[in-house]
């Protein structure tokens, strides 16, 4: 991954987070929504935005629908502040790494509790 793409990943993550906090008025997108990572393609035409919600994935489909419906808004607002040749198309994906990590830790705890100590 080039240094430029890494910088754009950081920039887009910060900008989308700020827009979610200050500009977006959709009630499905509350302050518990977290932008975990942005992955811009090497040609800078597409960006995958990984999001999660602190309350879990209960309303995952509604949240993703709202975010993908607002993708053009994010693209337009960020383009106003950014001087890059191509503004990528944003695609929002649910990031379940936190939930998987919690499940993995739970399984590890169960296994270690059932093993006899040496």
From Swiss-Prot:
Pfam families: RBFA. InterPro entries: KH_dom-like_a/b (IPR015946), RbfA (IPR000238), RbfA_dom_sf (IPR023799), Ribosome-bd_factorA_CS (IPR020053). Keywords: Cytoplasm, Ribosome biogenesis. One of its GO terms (cellular component) is cytosol. It is found in: Cytoplasm. Transmembrane segments: none annotated. One of several proteins that assist in the late maturation steps of the functional core of the 30S ribosomal subunit. Associates with free 30S ribosomal subunits (but not with 30S subunits that are part of 70S ribosomes or polysomes). Required for efficient processing of 16S rRNA. May interact with the 5'-terminal helix region of 16S rRNA. HAMAP family: RbfA (MF_00003). This is Ribosome-binding factor A. It comes from Dehalococcoides mccartyi (strain ATCC BAA-2266 / KCTC 15142 / 195).
